[in-house]
Each structure stands twice: as C-alpha cells, then as structure tokens.
Design a protein with these regions (language model features):
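Short, amphipathic alpha-helical segments
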Residues: 32-39, 57, 74-77, 93, ...
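Acidic/histidine-rich catalytic cores and adjacent linkers
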Residues: 50-53, 57-61, 103-154
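Generic preference for hydrophobic/aromatic residues in regular secondary structure cores
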Residues: 15-16, 23, 72-74, 99, ...
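RNase H-like nuclease fold core
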Residues: 1-61, 65-70, 147-149
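Conserved beta-strand -> loop -> alpha-helix junction used to position metal-binding or nucleic-acid-contacting
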Residues: 54-103
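Repeat-unit-sized solenoid/scaffold elements
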Residues: 37-39, 43, 89-96, 139, ...
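Short, charged/polar low-complexity linear motifs in solvent-exposed/disordered segments
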Residues: 18, 25-26, 41-43, 82, ...
Length: 154
C-alpha cells in the first residue's frame, strides 16, 4: 500500500498484490492520503474476499495502529529514506556515516545480520548517543546528537 503524488494536489493510493505483482485497488486523491483512505481499500479487499496475509505500508502516522488486526511492516524503502532525512546525504559524524551505511544494507541482507550490525553499532556508539548539552535559552539539557539519535530509533 502506498500513495504517489504528482504535484501537491493530485495523487493515487494503490494496493498491490505482492505475490502476483498485480494492482488490486486504487483511489485517486486530491489531497494527502488519510487513514480512512487506506481503510476504504482494506474494506474493499475484504468485501471481495481477498485474504490479507500482511500489509507493507509507509509511515503514515497512526496507520499501523489502525491496521493492528493484520501483520504490518514498515516499507524498507521508506525506512531508509527516513534515516537519510535525519542524517542528510552527507553525515558529518563518524557515527552517522556508519549508521547510514548500515541502513542502506537493509534491503540487501537478512533480519539476523541487520540486527547484528545495528547491535554492534549501538555497542560502539550508544554512550555517545546519550550525550546531552545544556540549552542556553531554556536552561534544559537536550541530546547533543539528536539527528543521529532519531535516525537510530526510527
């Protein structure tokens, strides 16, 4: 399940059968997609007796919770894009550079290896991620490496 846009006011929400690579349902959109749009597609599948084995979707806020009765996986492509947004295309820290390399292996490795790489990265950089800096404006301590931290926890 995913939506694609052309400009700001026209898009299409698609549901594709991952096994047969066949379009099952679509809805044209004149604004951003909503959870209700996705649920409309799921309901159409159910009405037409499709067996839903799992759902791969983007990170629309609240969508996994709305689809909690199904196995839901966050799209690997979107996950890598999220990491890139936090780290930028040219990370400034060694930790960020290493994390980005690991993220880009997501689609090319198995679960056990990927988790192992993340665990090793965290073992090396975990304490560094916890560093805090005093914000002179608020007087509160904030995480020093917020973007790398956000990328890791995303």
């Amino acid at each position: 399940m995913d939506a694609t846009y052309w400009g700001k006011n026209f898009g299409v929400l698609l549901i594709v059968d991952a096994y047969r690579k066949r379009l099952l349902w679509r809805k044209f959109l004149d604004k951003k997609e909503t959870i209700a749009d996705y649920l409309e597609g799921i309901e159409w599948l159910r009405e037409h007796k499709f067996k839903i084995l799992g759902i791969v979707c983007d990170g629309l806020w609240g969508l996994p919770q709305a689809l909690a009765r199904y196995k839901v996986q966050y799209c690997q492509f979107h996950q890598v894009k999220t990491v890139d947004e936090y780290l930028t295309k040219n990370p400034q820290t060694d930790a960020g550079k290493e994390l980005q390399k690991i993220a880009h292996l997501l689609c090319h490795t198995d679960k056990k290896s990927f988790i192992g790489m993340l665990d090793m990265w965290y073992e090396k950089w975990g304490e560094w991620l916890k560093h805090r800096t005093l914000d002179k404006n608020t007087g509160k301590k904030t995480y020093t490496h917020r973007r790398v931290r956000s990328a890791y926890f995303s």
